A protein has these predicted regions:
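Positively charged, small/polar-rich N-terminal and surface patches that mediate targeting and assembly
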Residues: 401-405, 420-581
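Glycine- and aromatic-enriched membrane alpha-helices
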Residues: 1-457
């Protein structure tokens, strides 16, 4: 006989865990740049939709299809007998619950590899995680495998879900390499802020809410007083650890950086949730407090370590949240377990090193297996598909190149649609993309120059010798343009992000299959004032830097300047320009 209350509770937990996908999507989108928002939303949708059939086909069977030491069994499409699980809920309810857990492990990886991963590659490795990686690790810990038989304890997935996803996230981010512009030539990291902190915060609130289903639902039961008491403790410990971790992270960043860091504090909330997940059923509230306390410190130190020392670029902090705190939460069981629901009490509760040793053994072996398998998967993907997108795609944004989406925010293009989706044709292609081989006519067509007529200024003088050069260019060309101007000796420039209305013929971005006619396109306007340096040299350097062989590469305006005043010193004209050229 099935228990109706247990069935309902498990389904509620499953639905909450499913809704975590929305939280992850908002977090990742908010903590990254706007030009990749559509790509991130697609990834978080597709890892669940790809993982669900994969887990049904063989994943669930590998995880729960038997009690073998290494794998459960090979049971395609879940046709076998699962009575050995001893469930008092329908099998399909349990399958739904485990499916959403599998999806969570897969979606964790998305954040650390954001803004530079080939979308095809993402789909393939998401399938691999759901087919063989997560199920086999899950079998060892939850499905009757060798770790479970040794007494390894992971109530709701600090190790099985978050550590596994975090290890893959770390490996993937390391193999991909950092985003363009993340580190300078000396290895110093540069901040690349996310574009929407509100979305990131909303994602954290959603995840926190859903974690009550993630941890609380893992009891699978509310039918007895004992089950209700344990579930209540699980939910209380979950909330307490997250709250403490959040406070600690806020205070720690306040002391460390001089101001309380918002995005780091949001990560602190998630760190506390991850850390308490393994032991929420076996630690006391005092244990939960200390687990959350350490998690709040660990997430900050981990982010700094991977950013500054390891040079692993993790845009959303997924490695620090899920890997570092998944490891910590799993170890914490061996320290703070009261002995309830574990074979041995933790070290601090008189149980010695037995439980701690089992937890450490489990972490090492699981992580070793995951690293070996996913290293092979990533290498194969890189060889046959390509793991990382080309530099041009990364600079323009994955939305326009991977999905034909000019912007996730209607009316404002975040990616430069002209360069990203250009289809060479008679309207735009000038026939030569190498500036060293292009004719003057081709270069002038790609980057036209407009010069202001010299007016009479005073005393019959037509030209002061000072000029302002205003250059309108594509976002992706800024670094080349800046380098070209610096090589001439121009070090002072004003750079403005501007939006232009219109669309270049030959672009192919669409929304719901319908071509987009008009949008606001992002450009940069670079302005320099020169006197000693030849204005013609500046113009020629800019034309060569911007040229790609298409109409619309840029435009240059040259103006006469009558007077320049440096506010700080009061110097005027030529003297005022000497430290910027």
């Amino acid at each position: 006989m099935f228990s109706s209350i247990n069935t309902c509770w498990t389904l509620v937990g499953a639905f909450l865990v499913y809704f975590m996908q929305a939280g992850f999507a908002l977090c990742e989108a908010g903590f990254t740049r706007a030009k990749n928002t559509g790509n991130i939303l697609m990834k978080n949708m597709m890892d669940f939709c790809i993982g669900t059939p994969c887990y049904w086909i063989i994943g669930f069977g590998l995880m729960f299809g038997g009690t073998g030491a290494l794998i459960g069994g090979f049971d395609p499409f879940i046709q076998g007998d699962y009575s050995h699980l001893g469930l008092d809920i329908p099998l399909w309810v349990y399958i739904v619950f485990q499916t959403v857990f599998c999806a969570t492990a897969a979606t964790i990886v998305s954040g650390s590899m954001a803004e530079r991963t080939n979308f095809k590659a993402y789909c393939v490795y998401s399938a691999a995680i759901s087919l063989v990686v997560y199920p086999i690790c899950g079998h060892w810990m939850w499905g009757g495998g060798w770790l479970q038989s040794m007494g390894f304890h992971d109530f709701a997935g600090s190790a099985a879900v978050h550590n596994v996803g975090g290890v893959i996230a770390l490996l993937g981010a390391w193999m991909l390499g950092p985003r363009i512009g993340k580190y300078d030539k000396d290895g110093k990291p540069h901040a690349i802020p996310g574009h929407n902190l509100t979305a990131g915060a909303l994602g954290v609130f959603i995840l926190w809410f859903c974690w009550f289903g993630f941890n609380g639902g893992s009891s699978l039961s509310l039918a007895t007083d004992e089950a209700m008491t344990m579930t209540g403790l699980v939910c209380f410990n979950t909330n307490l650890a997250a709250a403490v971790a959040t406070c600690v992270t806020m205070i720690f960043t306040w002391l460390r950086y001089g101001k309380p860091d918002v995005s780091m504090t949001l990560n602190g909330s998630l760190a506390g949730l991850v850390a308490i997940t393994a032991g929420c059923d076996t630690v006391s509230p005092f244990g939960a407090f200390f687990i959350g306390f350490v998690a709040g410190l660990l997430v900050v130190l981990s982010v700094e370590f991977f950013d500054n020392i390891a040079k692993v670029d993790d845009p959303v902090g997924a490695v620090s949240v899920h890997f570092a705190n998944g490891v910590w939460g799993t170890i914490a069981v061996g320290l703070f377990s009261t002995g309830a629901n574990t074979e041995h009490a933790g070290l601090f509760y008189g149980g010695g090193l037995a439980q701690l040793g089992t937890q450490l053994l489990g972490l090492v072996t699981v992580d070793l297996y995951v690293v070996v398998v996913m290293f092979v998967v990533f290498k194969l993907i890189d060889k046959f598909i390509g793991l990382r997108v080309p530099a041009e795609v990364e600079i323009d944004g994955l939305d326009i190149h991977e999905h034909g989406l000019a912007s996730a925010y209607a009316g404002f293009s975040i990616s430069d649609a002209n360069s990203a989706a250009m289809v060479p044709n008679e309207n735009t292609d000038l026939g030569e993309d190498d500036v060293t081989k292009a004719t003057d006519k081709q270069i002038s067509a790609a980057v036209p120059v407009v010069r202001e007529a010299s007016p009479v200024i005073h005393d019959g003088v037509y030209d002061t010798g000072m000029h302002k050069v205003s250059i309108i260019a594509k976002l992706s060309k800024f670094d080349q343009l800046k380098t070209a101007l610096n090589d001439l000796g121009v070090t002072g420039m004003t750079v403005t992000q501007v939006m232009g209305c219109g669309i270049q013929k030959g672009t192919s971005e669409k929304y719901r299959g319908v071509p987009v006619d008009t949008t606001l396109l992002p450009k940069i306007k670079v302005e320099v004032i020169v006197s000693r340096i030849s204005v013609d040299a500046v113009v020629e350097a800019a034309k060569k830097a911007l040229y790609t062989g298409h109409i619309g590469d840029g435009k240059i305006f040259v103006y006469n300047v009558t007077r320049v005043v440096k506010i700080r010193t009061g110097e005027e004209d030529f003297a005022a320009l000497q430290d910027v050229e």
